[in-house]
Amino acid sequence: MSMFNIIRKEFQFGQHQVVLETGRVARQANTVLVTMGGVTVLVAVVAQPKAKAGQDFFPLTVNYQEKQYAAGRIPGGYGKREGRASEAETLISRLIDRPIRPLFPEGYFNEIQITATVVSSDKTMDADIAAMLGASAALSIAGTPFRGPIGGARVGLINGEYVLNPNFEQLAQSDLDLVVAGTESAVLMVESEAKELSEDQMLGAVLFGHDEMQIAVQAIKEFAAAAGAVESTWVAPTKNETLLEQLKAAFEAKISEAYTIAVKQDRYTALDALYAEAVAQFVPENDETGIADEVNELFEDLKYRTVRDNILSGKPRIDGRDTKTVRAIDVQVGVLDRAHGSALFTRGETQALVTTTLGNTRDALMVDTLAGTKTDNFMLHYNFPAYSVGETGRESGPKRREIGHGRLARRGVQAVLPAADRFPYVIRIVSDITESNGSSSMASVCGASLSLMDAGVPLKAPVAGIAMGLVKEGERFAVLSDILGDEDHLGDMDFKVAGSANGITALQMDIKIEGITEEIMEVALNQAYAGRMHILNEMNKVISRARAEISAHAPTFEVITINPDKIRDVIGKGGATIRQITEETKAAIDIEDNGTVRVFGETKAAARAAIAKIQALTAEVEPGKIYDGKVIRIVEFGAFVNIMPGTDGLLHISQISNERVANVSDVLKEGQDVKVQVADVDNRGRIKLSMKDIEQA
C-alpha cells in the first residue's frame, strides 16, 4: 500500500500542458505541485484555525521564491545560498496576493501564509502564472472561506494577434505584456506594460485573458473536488445593528460634513474629533465588554457608507470635485542645480520630486535571474517617506509597496525611452514622494517624463499617468478620475493608466468586488484617456520635448568605429592598455565585437582625450603620409622605426638619405626621433619607410 494519496489534474492551457498534484510533497500543509510547460512550482498554504486575540486585520502573507537549483545554478555571493527576496520575487509575491486578498470575507482575520517555491525551470518562461494557479488550487483545498478559485493568464500582442501565455522569445516580439487574474465571473487584477496601445486593444487583451483562463478555473474546481476539499466552517461575526443605528443617528450628518473639508489633515482632525466624541458617548469607562472595538469598527463602516452614498447620489466628492475633474496641477522643471534632470510635479495634495541621473555602462544594474545574469540600463526607484503623509516612521530599505509602485512607474515610462544604440546612457530615475493624498505612482510617471526631458533624454513622446476609482452599489456606479487616498480606501477599484498621447504604456487594475462589467472598464478607460490628455497638456505648457543638449553636469559620450582586428591593440595584454587609458583620462570605454567604441567622460575633454589615444592605437598606416617616428632597432641593412603604437616599419639603408650611407650607425641611433614617410605597404602588411627629401627637426 502506497504511503501517498496522490491527486492529479492535467489540462491544456494555451501552448502549455499544466499538471496539478497534491498528496506527494509537504503533506503537513495544503500543498500543490504545479507544472506548467518547463516550470514547476511548489505552493504550500497554511491557514490558522483561529484568529489571534485582538486581531483587527487580515494577515495574509504571500512569499514567492526562486531556488537557483531550479535552473541548475549555484547562487553567487560569499555564502553561496539564496538571500533576501529579489525585486522580481517581491513583485510576483504581490501579483499573487492582489487577486486573492479580496476573495476572503470581511471580518476574516485568521492568519494565512502562502509560500510558492520555483523548484524547476527550463528558463523559457516566467513562473508567475504557474505560481498563481498553484496558490489558487492550494487555497481551494485548504478549507478556508476563499471565494475562488481564481485563474491567471499572461497575454501578448504579436502582429496584431493576442497570444496566450507567451514565452520569453515571444515576449521579445510582443507589443504587450499583460497579466490578468480573476474568478469565473469577474476580473480582479491586471498588471501590464505596452508599447503605446489603444484603449480598445488593452480592454480586448483583458477580456481575452479572462475568457482563456476559464479553462484553468474549471480545472482547479475539478481538482479540489477530487482532493476532497471541505467547505469552511468559519462564520462571519454579526454586526451590532442597534449600535450602528445609534451611531448613524448621532454622527452621519457630522461625518458627511467632515468629508466636505478639502484639506486632508484638517479633514482627518475633524474625523478624529468625531470619533473621540462617539467613544465618549457610547463606551463606558473601564469597559470590559469589548464595545470599544465595536464602536471603532462601526464608525469606520459609517464613514465608508457616507462617502459612497454621497458619491452615488451625485453630491460633490470629498474635495468638491465632480467625478471627472482632475485636481489642480503645478509643474516645475530644473529645480535642482546639480541633478542631470529634475522636476517637481504637484497634483492637489500629492507631490513628487523626481530626478534623472545619466551614467555610463559601468553603472548598469546586474540582475541575477533563473535564466542567467542580465544587464539593466534603466532603473526607476520610488521612495515613500513617512513625512509625505504627516507621520513619523522608521526609515529602512524599500518596502513591497514601494517596489511595486516603482515598477509600475517604470512600466509607464519605459516604452518611450530612446533605443540604446541612439542614447547609450544608463538612466536612473528616483521619485521621492514629498506629499501624498492618492495616486503617487502616477505622479511619479509624470515627474519621470518631465525630469527625463529636462535631462535632455530624447523621449519618443511625453507620458502621464492617472488613477481612477469606482464606487458601485447594485446597478448604480460612478467612475472617479484622479482619486484621493480616501477614495482609494473606500472605493471598489484602483485603476491606474499611464501613457502618451499615442496610447497606453502601462495599466494596473485592482478590483475589490465582483460584478465589474465590460461597460464599467470601458467607461474607466475612456475617462482615464480624457484625464491623461488634460495632464499632458498641463505638462506640455512647461516642457514638451527634450532639451537640445544633455545637462552640463552629465557625463558626455563619443562614439567611434575601429577595425575589429584592432580591438586587441586597444585592450592590450590582460587589459593593461585599456586600463591605462581609463586611468589617465578618467573615461569609461565600452567596446563591442563589431568595432563600435563608446567613450564616456566626465567632461568632453576627457572623452576626446581617450578617443585620441584609441585612434592612435588603431589608426591604419597611410602610404605617402609623414609620421613622427622613433628608431627602435639598428640593423646592418637599415633601421626599424616605430611610427604608431604597435606599428613599426623598415627604414632601409638606401632610404635614409639622398647621399650614400655606408654605416647606419653613423646616421641613426636607437631612441632617436625622426620624421619618416610611408613609401609602401605590401600585401602582407609590411611597411617600407623613407627619410629622403624629408626635412628633419
Curated annotation (Swiss-Prot):
Enzyme's top EC category: transferase
Gene Ontology biological process terms, A to Z: mRNA catabolic process; RNA processing
InterPro entries given in the database record: ExoRNase_PH_dom1, ExoRNase_PH_dom2, ExoRNase_PH_dom2_sf, KH_dom, KH_dom_type_1, KH_dom_type_1_sf, NA-bd_OB-fold, PNPase
Occurrences of domain S1 motif (ranges): 624-692
CDD domains, sorted: KH-I_PNPase (cd02393), RNase_PH_PNPase_1 (cd11363), RNase_PH_PNPase_2 (cd11364), S1_PNPase (cd04472)
The organism's place on the tree of life at top rank: Bacteria
Record-listed E.C. numbers: 2.7.7.8
GO MF annotation list: 3'-5'-RNA exonuclease activity; magnesium ion binding; polyribonucleotide nucleotidyltransferase activity; RNA binding
Keyword set, alphabetical order: Cytoplasm, Magnesium, Metal-binding, Nucleotidyltransferase, RNA-binding, Transferase
Gene3D superfamilies: GHMP Kinase, N-terminal domain, K Homology domain, type 1, Nucleic acid-binding proteins
Assembly: Component of the RNA degradosome, which is a multiprotein complex involved in RNA processing and mRNA degradation.
Protein name (Swiss-Prot/TrEMBL): Polyribonucleotide nucleotidyltransferase
